[in-house]
Amino acid sequence: MKKTDKILKEIGIQRVAIMEGKKYSKGFMEDGDIGVQY
């Protein structure tokens, strides 16, 4: 369950980031990992 929860959380964060758009995209490109931002 934990692995699935982590994946779902990351998908949720990614979805928010897509809606937020440019606000987060630079950080994602630099880090190369969605999780690093949070």
Swiss-Prot record:
<keyword id="KW-0456">Lyase</keyword>
<keyword id="KW-0210">Decarboxylase</keyword>
<protein>
    <recommendedName>
        <fullName>Histidine decarboxylase small chain</fullName>
        <ecNumber>4.1.1.22</ecNumber>
    </recommendedName>
</protein>
<keyword id="KW-0670">Pyruvate</keyword>
<dbReference type="GO" id="GO:0006520">
    <property type="term" value="P:amino acid metabolic process"/>
</dbReference>
<comment type="subunit">
    <text>Heterohexamer of 3 large and 3 small chains.</text>
</comment>
<dbReference type="InterPro" id="IPR016104">
    <property type="entry name" value="Pyr-dep_his/arg-deCO2ase"/>
</dbReference>
<dbReference type="GO" id="GO:0004398">
    <property type="term" value="F:histidine decarboxylase activity"/>
</dbReference>
<dbReference type="InterPro" id="IPR016106">
    <property type="entry name" value="Pyr-dep_his-deCO2ase_N"/>
</dbReference>
